[in-house]
């Protein structure tokens, strides 16, 4: 790896890359992406990456604002057993980013792939080079991550060298218990902050296990077999993946040797109580379940677990070291054992040094500090328990409001998606946006093949009334083909809510920020009636 990074560094120097230059990468989760990042960081240049499955406009909206000097890209990628050639997309990006002084093409799909006017990866890495790291100030930009961009141009979130190093050393060494001899895996793409955290495993001397492809191809057992094959110590996935394995009836421990896995990390959405039980019963009771919550904004977790902290079903075990987490009510008072806004009352090292193109800091202050002066509001509903663990209830801007009682969406999804007849769901309260005095609580369902709404609806009404409350029972259940999701797989609760409240769909959501933009059509049609 050191030799490859040295070669990439030498190649970037030949292309004129220096301190402060932006190098953008349309690369999958592969060793070349890891080496390229390390080479860019060694020069004091600024890294930014997107997954090659992002659409042209989604990538352009992110990369173009950085005015990059070099683009690193693949000819294509494979997903779910299919090949996708993205050279047309690469060329379109080159045409729309006039600041580019060079484009490097990595033949990933086809060894003979070419694109006129580009430098081949083999040319970039042809000459050996020493691996030197240029000294930079503590807050010098390391990389630019992005907000989801569902309601406008994605915000470029700039994080600094020093803050990321301090934060990731703490998280990986102390919370994840990683170090020499440990093997760290997280299923991610280069377009999600978990890739940035994953590669930081090298800092603590761990072996990083990288995987490119679908977690469900050829079946949901793929990642579990990967863990067994490579002796993964810390196995990281998203909560929806755990829930999918649970609903599919998988029991990895019955077919594979799962003794290597000491901890399972889960993030991206709240992990349900049933999800916790499934890990214990189907993967192994020796596995510490580490449910985590944080954000791209800080490229880490505020709430997570630790080797010396108890695990409670459905809860995040503790606040992260150095994270001054609290729950605030509407008046800005701290509350315990009540649901409130998740806030940070003191700085964390990896907080953004800035937003890109925000010279006076006004957009950054508006994003985090507008509600509680001097206090970071993250936008999640959280309850701190009396034993100092935490429960996440979903995004606070997608709150359900029934009879003046506020409810998060996470509990709702746990019950609804606990049904083996439901593949996915979305719940929206139109009253909250003032769409009408008699707004509705709507539940959109993606049914599994063979299931019918007529059969499912009575069961769900009964389950929600029994397991949550009568207030949680929707006014209507509506079957749809798909739930709109962001490029990183998050449910688009707020954009759908805005569309149903009468906001112009073009103002409510950027289609290019969605993984499945056509899924919006039924919601738009419903709003027009």
Label for each model-derived stretch:
Residues 50-75, 90, 228, 235, ...:
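AMP-binding/adenylate-forming catalytic core of the ANL superfamily
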Residues 165-183, 193-233, 248-249:
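Conserved AMP-binding/adenylation subdomain of ANL enzymes
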Residues 42-123, 238-239:
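Structural core segment of the AMP-binding/adenylate-forming
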Residues 104-105, 117-146, 153, 161-168, ...:
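Conserved pre-ATP/AMP-binding loop-to-beta segment of ANL
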Residues 28, 70-89, 110, 212-216, ...:
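Adenylate-forming
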Residues 9, 22, 28-49, 53-56, ...:
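A short helix-loop-beta submotif of the ANL/AMP-binding
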Residues 1-38, 55-60, 116, 120-123, ...:
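Conserved AMP-binding/adenylate-forming core of the ANL superfamily
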Residues 174, 211, 262-389, 395-399, ...:
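Conserved AMP-binding/adenylate-forming
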């Amino acid at each position: 790896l050191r030799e490859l990074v040295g070669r990439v560094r030498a190649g970037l120097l030949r292309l004129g890359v220096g301190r402060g230059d932006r190098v953008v990468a349309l690369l999958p989760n592969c060793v070349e992406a890891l080496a390229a990042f390390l080479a860019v960081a060694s020069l004091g240049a600024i890294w930014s990456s997107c997954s090659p499955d992002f659409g042209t406009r989604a990538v352009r909206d992110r990369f173009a604002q950085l005015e990059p000097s070099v683009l690193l890209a693949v000819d294509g990628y494979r997903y779910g057993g299919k090949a996708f050639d993205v050279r047309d997309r690469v060329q379109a990006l080159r045409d729309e980013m006039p600041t580019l002084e060079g484009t490097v093409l990595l033949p990933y799909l086809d060894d003979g792939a070419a694109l006129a006017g580009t430098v081949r990866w083999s040319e970039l890495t042809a000459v050996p080079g020493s691996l030197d790291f240029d000294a930079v100030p503590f807050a010098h930009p390391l990389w630019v991550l992005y907000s989801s961009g569902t309601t406008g141009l994605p915000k470029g979130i700039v994080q600094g060298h020093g803050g990321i190093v301090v934060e990731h050393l703490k998280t990986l060494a102390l919370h994840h218990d990683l170090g020499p001899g440990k093997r760290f895996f997280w299923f991610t793409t280069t377009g999600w902050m978990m890739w940035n955290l994953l590669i930081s495993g090298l800092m603590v001397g761990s072996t990083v296990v990288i995987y490119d492809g679908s977690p469900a191809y050829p079946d949901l057992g793929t990642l579990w077999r990967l863990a067994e094959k490579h002796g993964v110590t810390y196995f990281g996935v998203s909560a929806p993946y755990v829930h999918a394995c649970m609903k599919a009836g998988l029991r990895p421990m019955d077919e594979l040797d799962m003794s290597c896995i000491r901890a399972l990390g889960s993030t991206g959405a709240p992990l349900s109580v049933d999800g916790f039980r499934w890990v214990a019963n189907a993967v192994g009771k020796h596995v510490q379940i580490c449910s985590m919550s944080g954000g791209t904004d800080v490229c880490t977790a505020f709430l997570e677990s630790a080797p010396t902290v108890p695990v409670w079903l459905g809860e995040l075990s503790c606040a992260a070291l150095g994270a001054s987490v609290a729950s605030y009510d509407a008046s800005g008072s701290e509350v315990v054992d009540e649901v409130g806004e998740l806030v940070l009352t003191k700085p964390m090292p990896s907080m953004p040094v800035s937003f890109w193109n925000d010279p006076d800091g006004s957009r950054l202050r508006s994003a985090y500090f507008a509600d509680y002066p001097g206090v970071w509001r993250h936008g999640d509903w959280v309850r701190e328990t009396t034993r100092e663990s935490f429960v996440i209830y979903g995004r606070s801007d997608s709150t359900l409001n029934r009879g003046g009682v506020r409810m998060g969406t996470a509990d709702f999804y746990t019950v609804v998606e606990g049904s083996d007849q439901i593949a996915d769901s979305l719940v929206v309260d139109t009253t909250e946006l003032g769409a009408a005095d008699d707004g509705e609580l709507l539940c959109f369902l993606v049914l599994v093949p063979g299931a019918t709404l007529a059969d499912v609806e009575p069961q769900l009404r009964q389950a929600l009334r029994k397991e949550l409350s009568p207030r949680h029972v929707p006014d209507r259940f509506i079957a749809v083909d798909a739930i709109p999701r962001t490029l990183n797989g998050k449910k688009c609760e707020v954009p759908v809510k805005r569309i149903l409240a009468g906001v112009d769909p073009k103002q409510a959501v950027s289609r290019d920020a969605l993984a499945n933009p056509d899924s919006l059509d039924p919601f738009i049609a419903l709003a027009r009636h």
